[in-house]
Amino acid sequence: GKNSPYRVLAIPEKFTLYDFAYVITDSFDFDFDHAFGFYNHLTRYTQATEAYERFYDDPSTRYVCNPFTKGVEKTLVNTGFTEIGKQMLFYYDYGDRWNFRVELLRIEPAEPGKKYPECVQSVKKARQQYPDEDWDEDE
């Protein structure tokens, strides 16, 4: 929604969707330890007609994918995000069901000497990935 936290991220064009998924989760301080996918249906991934899933890259889980599904490990970001304004649902953790709306805002040449990926803008504090867990990392 309009009041949701969001991030503007600058990523290199050679990044795969897998790399991009890591950058998204990292920008929200999430662990990168769950299955995920990118879908062209923004509210219901099950109704998508274009999908890129982590499940596809693993031969033991590929059978759960739709015939049109592609993987994320070898698919470049510009394969999924083909034009300015293209939006996709980044669905992370099928158990906890985190929904991120991802949009290609612009394509710009890399600035010489700048390190990418970069979080260009961070609006609002991210929600906690595991809000109910009461554990100490030192234990």
Residue ranges and their predicted role:
Residues 1-139:
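Short linear regulatory motifs enriched in tryptophan with gly/pro/ser
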